């Protein structure tokens, strides 16, 4: 199993290009199930999660062709509307085939999902919404089985803000009979990107980006070409890496448009951040000032950046309080950061981080995707060598990580 070896103490400098957003690409790939016509997507990142989903779609009968960052999907013949456990167990986003399959085929059988082990992320909101639209849904032997002749528009209220739930129900509603209204909808930019693609395919959607989304169903959707938005979490991760090392970098093919909460905190920490057209510059001070963090749904501070900010607070001046309000059990990286010398105390959903002068290299273990990123950042700052085990988590969400870090001057390589 591969590991990542980092020789710390190097100030990051230079330029790197940001990839397309994994969390936008995954639902948009699933949206291709809604039409018999080809859908072409560009700026698709080359990641393990993307490969897993493309393999799953292929098993269902979708013809997939890929040329680097361009993917064309032809779902004219779906002959197997099933997502088996073997394909689903490593990736929670596979639940996103449920809505499109039910809407298009009238039936779906999808294994309950896996993915990062960061607490309970139930699919009950997906099921409740499909039931309100007329589907008969059962959960047996680890599978969600949904059947309907045609979905009917309905007024849906999610008990909690759920990104994948909003996406699943929005896709399902595109082919429903009548109007569907999703209240308490997720407002994330990735939801908007999905809506933009669906509209290009002929869907009638309004309100994406607000907490009330309206979808008027149509009889059929068309093919389309769509460019996946830049990955705001990858962008934030590299900004944090530069900030932690006292570096100065320029990130291209990205924007601060969806990163206000992250950029504000980096500036509070002492960084200069300049937005250019399709690029961001960051210049960090010699040592950061600690910043308090509270995660909340978009447009507030994203939970997917919590671990990275724990890493930069670990070497900042002062003490910081980090509150995680989205997921339970999302402080598993704290123990690994402590192995590097970080001073962190956990009390329920709150972490108190007292910045230290320096971290020391050690062997640490990644526990989930964003936790892996925090360990990379800490390893870049630490004195000596840091070895990160179980980096398959990183391969799920960061395209060409070693190559991009090396372009910024980091001493990092993959080892067996």
From Swiss-Prot:
Pathway annotation from the record: Cell wall biogenesis; peptidoglycan biosynthesis
List of residues that carry 2-(S-cysteinyl)pyruvic acid O-phosphothioketal: 116
Catalytic residues as annotated in Swiss-Prot or TrEMBL:
116
Q: Which organism is it from?
A: Aromatoleum aromaticum (strain DSM 19018 / LMG 30748 / EbN1) (Azoarcus sp. (strain EbN1))
- Which compartment or compartments is the protein found in? Cytoplasm
- Where phosphoenolpyruvate binds, per the record, is at 22-23
Q: What protein name applies here?
A: UDP-N-acetylglucosamine 1-carboxyvinyltransferase
The record's EC number reads 2.5.1.7
Span-the-membrane segments of this chain are none
Among InterPro entries, the record links this protein to: Enolpyruvate_Tfrase_dom, Enolpyruvate_Tfrase_sf, MurA_subfamily, RNA3'P_cycl/enolpyr_Trfase_a/b, UDP_GlcNAc_COvinyl_MurA
Q: Name one GO biological process term.
A: peptidoglycan biosynthetic process
Entry keyword set: Cell cycle, Cell division, Cell shape, Cell wall biogenesis/degradation, Cytoplasm, Peptidoglycan synthesis, Pyruvate, Transferase
Q: Which family does it belong to?
A: Belongs to the EPSP synthase family. MurA subfamily.
Q: What does this protein do?
A: Cell wall formation. Adds enolpyruvyl to UDP-N-acetylglucosamine.
Instruction: Cite the binding residues for UDP-N-acetyl-alpha-D-glucosamine.
Output: 92, 121-125, 304, 326
Q: Does the keyword Cytoplasm apply?
A: yes
As its record notes, the protein acts as a catalyst of: phosphoenolpyruvate + UDP-N-acetyl-alpha-D-glucosamine = UDP-N-acetyl-3-O-(1-carboxyvinyl)-alpha-D-glucosamine + phosphate
């Amino acid at each position: 199993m591969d590991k990542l070896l980092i020789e710390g103490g190097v100030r990051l400098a230079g330029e790197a290009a940001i990839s397309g957003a994994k969390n936008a690409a995954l639902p948009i790939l699933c949206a291709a199930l809604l039409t018999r016509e080809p859908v072409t997507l560009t700026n698709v990142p080359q990641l393990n999660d993307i490969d897993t989903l493309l393999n799953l779609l292929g098993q269902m009968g979708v013809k997939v062709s890929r040329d680097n960052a361009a993917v064309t999907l032809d779902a004219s013949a779906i002959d197997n509307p099933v997502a088996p456990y073997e394909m689903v167990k490593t990736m929670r986003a596979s639940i996103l085939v449920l809505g499109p399959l039910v809407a298009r085929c009238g039936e779906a059988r999808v294994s309950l999902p896996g993915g990062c082990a960061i607490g309970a992320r139930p699919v009950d909101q997906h099921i409740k919404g499909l039931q309100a639209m007329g589907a008969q849904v059962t959960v047996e032997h680890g599978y969600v089985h949904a059947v309907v002749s045609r979905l009917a528009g309905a007024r849906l209220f999610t008990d909690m803000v759920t990104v994948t739930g909003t996406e699943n129900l929005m896709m399902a509603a595109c082919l429903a009979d009548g109007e569907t209204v999703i209240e308490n909808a997720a407002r994330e930019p990735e939801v908007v990107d999905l809506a933009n693609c669906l509209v290009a395919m002929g869907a009638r959607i309004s309100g994406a980006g607000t907490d009330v989304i309206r979808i008027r169903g149509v009889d059929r959707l068309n093919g389309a070409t769509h460019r996946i938005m830049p990955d705001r979490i990858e962008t934030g991760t590299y900004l944090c890496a530069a900030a932690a090392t006292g570096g100065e970098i320029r990130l291209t093919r990205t924007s601060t448009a969806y990163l206000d909460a992250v950029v504000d905190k980096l500036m509070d920490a002492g960084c200069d951040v300049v937005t250019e057209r399709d690029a961001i510059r960051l210049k960090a001070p010699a040592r950061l000032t600690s910043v308090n963090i509270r995660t909340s749904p978009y447009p507030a501070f994203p939970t997917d950046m919590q671990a990275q900010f724990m890493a930069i607070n670990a070497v900042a001046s002062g003490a910081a309080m980090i509150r995680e309000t989205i997921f339970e059990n999302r402080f598993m990286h704290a123990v690994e950061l402590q192995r590097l010398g970080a001073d962190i105390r956990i009390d329920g959903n709150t972490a108190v981080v007292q910045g230290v002068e320096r971290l020391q290299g050690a062997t640490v273990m990644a526990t989930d995707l964003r936790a892996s990123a925090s360990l990379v950042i800490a390893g870049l700052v630490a004195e000596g060598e840091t070895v990160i085990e179980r980096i398959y988590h990183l391969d799920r969400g960061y395209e060409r990580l070693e190559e991009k870090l090396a372009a910024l001057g980091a001493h990092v390589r993959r080892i067996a």
